[in-house]
């Protein structure tokens, strides 16, 4: 005699389906919560209104010259350097490569180690440099590489352009140190530079600040702090291809991915990652919200800034960071300008004197700084 079929298998199947449903709901809730935090707490305001074309455009021809072709070819060595290198050693390899890139060049300047109130640095002095005419230079390198040594082709030129002393600050880098320490080091160096020159304690007659890429970000952040702290403002400042928005919202980050031969290969994989995940990664990495003006100067109060010049390439990934910053600063009433070049790589000014466009850009910088400086005594 056949008995009634047991209900246990059906109950077990129903239980399994319920468990799966609960798991799916839990995952959706967690992912939705993470997404909501990124969008409403980490991303900040939509700044697409500041995507208007702005600035002076420079070009030495309709097509790239042979010199920029040679520079781009040399950048291809980076990929070869990293081939087969474990992730944990990549920073060390890139740091060594960047520091040694321009070794052996005859710069014609004097290099003097400096202790900027506890922060190491390097004075760069062209012949006849006025020690009371001072520039604080903040190097780039994605906050993880670079040094005064790596940027001597720029700091030596700034000393000649201004006729003064350049202090290249050796701020602390990630990941060995928190992101905030680099900001603090630049602030200390600026305070110190106001009252100390290469020949000892003495007030500065003229003060400039300049930086490139990550150093441009630190430069713009420093300007906000100097204003809010009531310190003597620099007479003028320069930012070369700066990162201005740590929320990574600028359209050119994706639009110029394939036209940027320097940043594209290094950061291209990030373009495939959803922005909300990048926001979380940035927050966890720096312990600072990506939309915090401390690391996103684009999102700060941009009124009452000193005369400021930004230079950027129209084909680099960070171009819109500059364009948005200048549009927003001008709307706030600050004397901020953008100069744009076609066909150039990120921070092409460092490739001087071989690049004609680098020489042209540096000439513009010299004219800008000297026009803003107080008369020489």
Label each PLM-derived region with a short phrase.
Residues 2, 14-15:
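Leucine-biased recognition of intrinsically disordered, low-complexity hydrophobic segments
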Residues 18-126, 374-377:
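A glycine/proline-hinged amphipathic helix-loop "lid/cap" segment
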Residues 25, 29-45, 110-377:
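Alpha/beta-hydrolase superfamily serine-hydrolase fold, recognizing
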């Amino acid at each position: 005699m056949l008995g009634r079929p047991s209900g246990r298998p059906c109950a077990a199947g129903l239980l399994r389906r319920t468990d799966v449903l609960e798991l799916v709901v839990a995952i959706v809730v967690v992912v939705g919560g993470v997404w909501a935090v990124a969008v409403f707490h980490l991303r900040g305001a939509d700044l697409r209104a500041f995507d208007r074309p702005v600035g002076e455009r420079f070009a030495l021809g309709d097509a790239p010259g042979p010199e920029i072709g040679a520079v781009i070819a040399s950048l291809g060595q980076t990929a070869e350097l990293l081939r087969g290198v474990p992730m944990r050693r990549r920073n060390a390899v890139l740091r060594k490569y960047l520091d040694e890139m321009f070794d052996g060049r005859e710069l014609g300047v004097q290099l003097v180690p400096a202790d900027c109130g506890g922060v190491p640095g390097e004075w760069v002095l062209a012949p006849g440099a006025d020690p009371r005419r001072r520039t604080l230079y903040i190097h780039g390198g994605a906050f993880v590489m670079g040094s005064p040594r790596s940027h001597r082709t720029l700091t030596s030129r700034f000393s000649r352009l201004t006729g003064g002393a350049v202090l290249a600050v050796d701020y602390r880098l990630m990941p060995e140190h928190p992101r905030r320490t680099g900001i603090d080091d630049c602030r200390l160096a600026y305070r110190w530079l106001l009252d100390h020159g290469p020949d000892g304690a003495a007030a500065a007659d003229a003060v400039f600040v300049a930086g490139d890429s990550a150093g441009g970000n630190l430069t713009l952040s420093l300007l906000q702090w100097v204003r809010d702290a009531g310190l003597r403002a620099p007479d003028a400042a320069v930012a070369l291809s700066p990162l201005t928005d740590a929320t990574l919202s600028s359209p050119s980050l994706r639009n110029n991915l394939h036209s940027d031969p320097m940043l594209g290969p290094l950061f291209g994989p990030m373009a495939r990652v959803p922005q909300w995940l990048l926001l979380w990664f940035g927050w966890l990495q720096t312990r600072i919200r990506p939309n915090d003006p401390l690391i996103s100067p684009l999102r700060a109060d941009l009124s009452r800034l000193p005369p400021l010049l930004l230079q950027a390439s129209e084909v680099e990934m960070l171009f819109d960071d500059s364009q948005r910053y200048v549009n927003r600063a001008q709307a706030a009433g600050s004397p901020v300008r953008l100069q744009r070049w076609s066909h150039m790589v990120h921070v092409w000014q460092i490739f001087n004197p071989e690049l004609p466009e680098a020489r042209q850009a540096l000439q513009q910088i010299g004219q800008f700084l000297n026009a803003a400086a107080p008369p020489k005594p």
